[in-house]
Design a protein with these regions (language model features):
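Active-site C-terminal subdomain of aminotransferase-like
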Residues: 1-71, 75-76
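Conserved C-terminal alpha-helix-loop-beta "cap" of PLP-dependent enzymes
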Residues: 50-51, 55-123
């Protein structure tokens, strides 16, 4: 630690100058779970993910799990992955079988209706 005095961090903590990370996290969670704020913030992302899910189901896609969240886990033919990867950001989850892979598509607070429509057109 270069020129730092011995046990400097301990002295700072003892005098209350360094707040524990746990306290900061607790304050954030307390605010998020007050008056339904977390649900309000997440609602648009979840709504768009469910629109994506319904649109994919209508196109015949299968799902690894039935997710009520902003994350959807779809089963895709391996042959589609290179093309899909050049157009869409997705996460590899696992091989489903020799010919299929489970991928994760996620929406966020910044996802737009137009982006979901575009993704449905790509898929």
């Amino acid at each position: 630690h270069g020129n730092m005095p011995r046990q400097f961090e301990t002295m700072v903590k003892r005098h209350g100058a360094m707040v524990a990370k746990g306290r900061l996290n607790a304050v954030q969670f307390d605010a998020l779970f007050t008056d339904g704020l977390y649900e309000k913030i997440c609602a648009p992302a979840v709504r768009l993910a469910l629109k994506l899910r319904d649109g994919l189901a209508a196109k015949g896609y299968r799902f690894a799990i039935d997710s009520p969240t902003n994350q959807q886990f779809i089963i895709v033919e391996n042959s589609r992955l290179p093309e899909l990867g050049s157009k869409v950001a997705y996460s590899f989850i696992e091989k489903y079988d020799a010919e299929h892979t489970v991928i994760r598509l996620a929406t966020s607070w910044a996802t737009t209706e137009e982006q979901v429509d575009e993704l449905l057109n790509i898929l």
